[in-house]
Amino acid sequence: MKYQQLENLESGWKWAYLVKKHREGEAITRHIENSAAQDAVEQLMKLENEPVKVQEWIDAHMNVNLATRMKQTIRARRKRHFNAEHQHTRKKSIDLEFLVWQRLAVLARRRGNTLSDTVVQLIEDAERKEKYASQMSSLKQDLKDILDKEV
């Protein structure tokens, strides 16, 4: 396993995930009867700061259809949590208009690179172009100075 599991932290994430799903109207319990489901949800609401009991609640009451989705969500959250510790693995977001993103994605696919690699290549290309333009401007000025001296 690449990322260490932190039971207390992840228990809080699981609790928040289940509460969010409940507020969105999803059935988070395996109970068919409404009163039993409501009792289980009320128990869950009281367990926010009790990680061990949250896991026990999940084992006893959680809807089995939510299990896989919750595992995926927690795995992604764990990855983001650990990647955020280091500057080089921390993800940043930028706002792009859809058409700009679409053109960037097409270029990345054509070059066989990720979006990030493509952005880096575009920046490097622009820097080389600026350097070349600066050198050409300098050469033109030097040539002009030489020709002016001879006349």
Curated annotation (Swiss-Prot):
It is found in: Cytoplasm. Its main location: cytoplasm. One of its GO terms (biological process) is regulation of DNA-templated transcription. InterPro entries: Arc_rbn_hlx_hlx, MatP, MatP_C, MatP_N, MatP_N_sf. The keyword Oxidoreductase does not apply. Belongs to the MatP family. Homodimer. This is Macrodomain Ter protein. The lineage of its organism: Bacteria, Pseudomonadati, Pseudomonadota, Gammaproteobacteria, Enterobacterales.
